[in-house]
Amino acid sequence: MPIEDVLLDLKHKIEKNLPAGVTITDVEFEGPQLVLYTEEPRKFADDGNIIRNLAKELRTRIAMRPDPRVLATPEDSISIIEEVVPKESVISSYYFDPDSGEVIIEAEKPGLVIGKHGATLREITKQIGWIPKVVRTPPIKSRTVKNIREFMRNNLKERKEILKTVGRKIHRECTSKDQWVRVTALGGCKEVGRSCFLLSTPESRILIDCGVNVGSDENMTPYLYVPEVFPLNQIDAVIVTHAHLDHQGLVPLLFKYGYEGPVYCTPPTRDLMVLLQLDYIDVAAKEGKKIPYESGMVAKTLKHTIPLDYEEVTDIAPDIKLTFHNAGHILGSAISHFHIGDGLHNVVFTGDYKYEKTRLFDPAVNKFPRVETVISEATYGNANAFQPALKDAEKHLQMVVKNTIERGGIAVIPAFAVGRSQEVMIVLEESIRKGLIPEVPVYLDGMIWEATAIHATHPEYLNNDLRKLIFQKGQNPFLSECFKPVDSHEARQKIIQNPQPCVILATSGMMNGGPVMEYFKAFAEDPRNTLVFVGYQADGTIGRRIQKGWKEIPMTGKNGSTEMLKMNMEVQVVDGFSGHSDRRQLMEYVKRMQPRPERVFTEHGDEKACVDLASSVYKKLKIETRALTNLETVRLL
Amino acid sequence: MPIEDVLLDLKHKIEKNLPAGVTITDVEFEGPQLVLYTEEPRKFADDGNIIRNLAKELRTRIAMRPDPRVLATPEDSISIIEEVVPKESVISSYYFDPDSGEVIIEAEKPGLVIGKHGATLREITKQIGWIPKVVRTPPIKSRTVKNIREFMRNNLKERKEILKTVGRKIHRECTSKDQWVRVTALGGCKEVGRSCFLLSTPESRILIDCGVNVGSDENMTPYLYVPEVFPLNQIDAVIVTHAHLDHQGLVPLLFKYGYEGPVYCTPPTRDLMVLLQLDYIDVAAKEGKKIPYESGMVAKTLKHTIPLDYEEVTDIAPDIKLTFHNAGHILGSAISHFHIGDGLHNVVFTGDYKYEKTRLFDPAVNKFPRVETVISEATYGNANAFQPALKDAEKHLQMVVKNTIERGGIAVIPAFAVGRSQEVMIVLEESIRKGLIPEVPVYLDGMIWEATAIHATHPEYLNNDLRKLIFQKGQNPFLSECFKPVDSHEARQKIIQNPQPCVILATSGMMNGGPVMEYFKAFAEDPRNTLVFVGYQADGTIGRRIQKGWKEIPMTGKNGSTEMLKMNMEVQVVDGFSGHSDRRQLMEYVKRMQPRPERVFTEHGDEKACVDLASSVYKKLKIETRALTNLETVRLL
């Protein structure tokens, strides 16, 4: 059936299901959802159940778009909204898009604009006709969030066209009589870096992640040139499980080589992704490396990104529904559940996950309506890869920082911008608040502050305890006064030239560049100071050398000459802050999965880790399993 | 390097290696070989070593093409050839192709035209300039062979263009830095029928077999629509391991859907392939089934077919060399050995094979210069799938026929046209010659006689004993007077209406149509007659029903009504004539393979057979192994 007929058919169905007197003028697909055009938005707003019932009946997501002719003027609308919405919500901006009939309201407390079960939103529509969409005013100013929102506002027309195209493609007719499901491993198998998988059926092709291995020139890129994925315009959708570069660093490259389809990820992943992609090409340029794509491709990616919240079942292809679930790894990280066909097969890509409650996140979800195949990460899959408990790691950190401060020293913590930094920040904030460590400034340098701002913008993606603290008690730990962003060369020099007891969190996490190096150079020779590692240090990095006990570190000086830096500062390795499940958690995750899966494939770990984990899953849990190899295709059904 | 530069480079190299005074005018690729153009064919013919040494030096196959201006006239040439060549060779025709400078000589005894180590051929060139190519005059008239030869002669120009294109594609430059080898299963895994595999590297894609499952509408076709193979113009070469329809029946479909490249197979496979393809679409049309392609596509396939003899190492892609070896299954059946890269990986596709000497063929070859991966058939892979020894099968057949004849009866043997028929013929001929069964006519009906004619045209592809019998003793068993082809409806009616003790071999092999049904109807009610099964009877066929013991067989009468046929004739099942290795032979084939392979994948058998064989190969031979699944891709390197 041609798509126009599908739409006509849907329109008839909807009209049959509408209450008497409520009319629509048209229907259209807009990305994964169906939108209804109406001259009577107020009637729809009158009864919150109309849309809900339609969505249930048609088993799809539905939104309503008012006719521009029935809308109040923006001026009138603003004064009405400010009457309807409680002042405490603190609205910071409005953006009216007559084309979609949406008004985007930025508020400090979005919940108050939404009202109970959306009652306030409906009231707004009833009075002004416009459909309000609410976003949070970032509690910490974020350049990234601001730029993304502006960019999206400036490209609404193009965006609408993209969504229309995507929507019509998703809802095309299924044509094949065959039924099969395959997964092709394109990167990240028996290795870490360049994660990339293709999920395919006779109808559809879905790419899951498209990472870059920044540590390798030879194996930097997934095998994107194989016929299963190339030409890229045959791909239906790209899924990004989380924002780390080894999972999404080359998504813009797909657009450079002809991909034109949607990118699905959670809203925080979208924001972090833009931040990390721009930083990636920026760093590559500064290091004189080949830049795989220009910032224009980052923008193009953003234009094509469709954010999906956790637990939102979404059609992404004629025969595939995607649902994201919390993965507990970093902000917005998602376990991706694919429901294929009408009950044909269910496959879960875990992406990176943490099966333990951490300071920031709930443990990864492992309860699904159905699941036959699991493709699981295996970073700590080695038989003996146990990590200390988080509580112990935290105590260790507290002790190290306390000792350093008390002897008048400075604790320098190299950290990745996204993930462990925020975890460590929460621990430090609580320790200071509770008096467990002295009240000293915690400096945040590099992208850490910006990444933290993005965390603060998406509190819904943090765990229960943190959300309670923020929403109910009004205590946002990220806003604590102990945190001091370092936002200029001068600010950094001030800290260096007038050293006082403090904690410094700075990038990069493995000391292969970034502001952390300046602090290190300044503070390495004083034995009162401490260098605290909270993350994994790869071979070949300076961090690794220091861990090995090097006492003299060669540094490139200002004029290019090599100077030897004397290491007198204390070195402490605090294990246990990993965002990955350790061996025990990996096994528990599978063991406690509901329902029990039929087979588990392992990936994202060195060869031994992947094989060890697979072998144990088979031996201990009696589940069919295998470590995947790049470039192989497995048949799931 | 552009291909023109490659050729120029080759020309310089050749000129440097030529003896003083011998010159060439040009070089060009022609399929997998390099051809030299010269005005001095006589000088090349003078010294047989010139071409041989060049081929060794350049590690490629080389042929020489004389300039048309230096050739004798056809008339003069014929009289000179007839002076040079012994009369006993019995030349039946000449075809002069001035474009290639070749003269095709058809002779009853090609060996006498060739001379020792090609001495007579060289003498011919020395005297007339033309390059002689010798083919055998079919000892039994074969419509197929005649038509193919005529067709090829009539399309020499187009053929030359095809070979040039193929040759230039084979010798293109390798561009990828990656090194990997993959095999994708497209059909024939955990099933029999529609065999099809894709062998791929970063440089090349080779399709091995493209069969049709004639017994199934649903699973008739391999998975050709997947992106690894489609669009088909990206495939470098198609290999046909043998002529049965489940291995080659859909090769013409590839051309219908855009394939334009070469098809490699042995010369007998080519001839049998044309016969069986034309019969396949003919039968389908008669049965009112959908015809997958027209005869024009059979012709197109033939135009693109490049025959290769056993043991001939041939470049088929920039990084792949193919060598066929005897598989012992049917005439021309080949084990395909692929050497990939410069010593990178070696993979053997067994196709169907018999690892035992039979009346017609030597046992399948399992000695290779190198081999890492084997993809083996598993038709009789079941743990208990043992077949009686051939000797016992032959004795059983002799006894059955003897008893039938001696009681004045007729032995009706349903048989496939290609394979078992000729095996049974040889046994019957010898039995009659040696007086083990009475001297009665052996009628051959259906395509059996035509297929036998193709066997007689290619005696080089029969085993040592048969070749000796034919070439040294001048006894071609296929020419025995006991064999009586039935070539018309009238001839068949004569046999039926005046029944005399005799043997009748007729198609189809499973009694689902064909002339065998007319004999069956005529002779089923007389208990003196015997129905002798020598091949497998699939479920749902009349043959299978009779084997199960049905005593009344429903038959469609002339006016479409169903008549019940009373089964009074004796039924005998003679096991052991299979062209497939039985379980013991499959295991022995792998066990005695030299060198020992690193891994074995199984295919071409029902699921249990494939899994059983794989499991035993692992347990008993300690070789990594797995039963392949359709649509999966395995990484070999």
Swiss-Prot record, chains A, B:
Cofactor detail note: Binds 2 Zn(2+) ions, which are required for nuclease activity.
Stated name of the protein: Transcription termination factor FttA
Assembly behavior: Homodimer. Interacts with RNA polymerase (RNAP), interacts with the Spt4-Spt5 complex.
EC primary class: hydrolase
Needed co-factor(s): Zn(2+)
One Pfam family linked to the record: RMMBL
SUPFAM superfamilies: Metallo-hydrolase/oxidoreductase (SSF56281), Prokaryotic type KH domain (KH-domain type II) (SSF54814)
EC annotation from Swiss-Prot or TrEMBL: 3.1.-.-
Chain positions recorded as Zn(2+) 2 binding sites: D246, H247, D352, H604
CDD domains: KH-II_CPSF_arch_rpt1, KH-II_CPSF_arch_rpt2, TTHA0252-CPSF-like_MBL-fold
Region feature KHb, mapped onto this chain: 72-139
A single GO molecular function term of this UniProt record: RNA binding
PROSITE patterns for the chain: KH_TYPE_1
Function: Terminates transcription on the whole genome. Termination is linked to FttA-mediated RNA cleavage and does not require NTP hydrolysis. Cleaves endonucleolytically at the RNA exit channel of RNA polymerase (RNAP); the 5'-3' exonuclease activity of this protein degrades the nascent RNA released from RNAP.
Gene this chain is encoded by: fttA
SMART domains per the UniProt record, alphabetical: Beta-Casp, KH, Lactamase_B
Species this protein is from: Methanosarcina mazei (strain ATCC BAA-159 / DSM 3647 / Goe1 / Go1 / JCM 11833 / OCM 88)
Segments for region (Metallo-beta-lactamase N-terminus): 180-383
Region: Beta-Casp, residue numbers: 384-578
Residue numbers spanned by region Metallo-beta-lactamase C-terminus: 579-637
Family: Belongs to the metallo-beta-lactamase superfamily. RNA-metabolizing metallo-beta-lactamase-like family. FttA subfamily.
Region (KHa) residue spans: 4-71
Record-listed Zn(2+) 1 binding positions: H242, H244, H329, D352
GO BP terms in the entry: DNA-templated transcription termination
Signal peptide (residue range): none
Alphabetized UniProt keyword annotations: DNA-binding, Endonuclease, Exonuclease, Hydrolase, Metal-binding, Nuclease, RNA-binding, Transcription, Transcription regulation, Transcription termination, Zinc
